[in-house]
Amino acid sequence: MIAILLAVAFGITFTLFTTPFFIRLFRKIGWGQFIRLDGPRQHAIKRGTPTMGGLVIVVASIISYFLANFFLGLSVEPSGLLVIFMFVGMSLVGFLDDILKVRKQHSGGLGPFYKVVLQSFIAVPFALLTFLVKDARGIPHSSMSISFARDTGINFSALFSLGIIGVFSAWVLYLLWINLIAVSSVNAVNITDGLDGLAAGAMIFTMLAYVVIGFWQSGQNCARKSLPLENISKCYSVNGPLDMSILAAAILGSLLGFLWWNTNPSKIMMGDTGALALGGAAAALSILTHTQLLFLVLGGLFVIEAGSVILQIAFYKKYRRRIFLMSPLHHHFELKGWAEITVVVRFWIIAGLFTALGIGLFYADWLYS
């Protein structure tokens, strides 16, 4: 618990006090935000606001994670490093996208196809590493089961009984599944990052959930020798849950400090550098804590935002009419006359409710297992 609190404290301190330096630096080198031309008119004043603030979040989170472990003499575990791999990898994809926007002087960076391809180049190696990297007992960090609050009975490895073709099919399905989770997550968070502080605030709730989940899984882990007999049937076969909880706490703290400068009116934006990184970290945590489908609830706001875009496009293609005044959903409410800060705070409340529901479902699964 002390390591978790330290990680939060380090994260807050780093971003709260160093972000002003990066604001001045990014403004000096011309890393300013470009606004989509078809967006709400009131967003025009945001043009030129320093962007790529995600660099601050990523660096602060990683430093805070290592410092928290160092001060308490804890060893860094492969589970945390695997999350960092996805965190940094997706951040690099976002950074490339942001750099192209700055150079083109336009809000369009990487095309959708190239963005997904690069995201997959990060997600697929991550999926392979979760099996190749094992703990001291020789157990991999992931499984081929689709998970909710723990692994379900849906297991791709069941195809192994079909021979070589079955083994090949199982691996292909597993890689596609992990890729779907990762790519969907990073793009959903990126879509949500359209108003000052919206994505950062919503992700704070999601990271809080993974702090709680990791901490609980650590106390109820199958590897613990002191586990009460009545809890053995409920234990979690998760590698390094406390390490992931510490990393989630570091990200949470970094987001809290960053939000001080990112809230309306924003002094700096996280850009795709931050949005893709956060989506990648959340996806990695859901995979390694075996809570893949529960992530749909924990990150419910991101699902709604991404869903609004999909619905808008699909409905327009079929009926040549729009469901929303504009997508993503937060822009719809802006055009309905809601103030930006009103939309953000109300969406934060929704994100918090989804997180509470998700944690409740997670605990209920343990209670009634």
Swiss-Prot record:
It is an enzyme of class 2 (transferase). The gene is mraY. The lineage of its organism: Bacteria, Bacillati, Actinomycetota, Actinomycetes, Micrococcales. Its main location: membrane. The keyword Transmembrane helix applies. This is Phospho-N-acetylmuramoyl-pentapeptide-transferase. Its cofactor is Mg(2+). Pathway: Cell wall biogenesis; peptidoglycan biosynthesis. It is a multi-pass membrane protein. GO terms for molecular function: metal ion binding; phospho-N-acetylmuramoyl-pentapeptide-transferase activity; UDP-N-acetylmuramoyl-L-alanyl-D-glutamyl-meso-2,6-diaminopimelyl-D-alanyl-D-alanine:undecaprenyl-phosphate transferase activity. The chain crosses the membrane at residues 2-22, 54-74, 80-100, 113-133, 158-178, 195-215, 241-261, 268-288, 293-313, 347-367. Catalyzes the initial step of the lipid cycle reactions in the biosynthesis of the cell wall peptidoglycan: transfers peptidoglycan precursor phospho-MurNAc-pentapeptide from UDP-MurNAc-pentapeptide onto the lipid carrier undecaprenyl phosphate, yielding undecaprenyl-pyrophosphoryl-MurNAc-pentapeptide, known as lipid I.
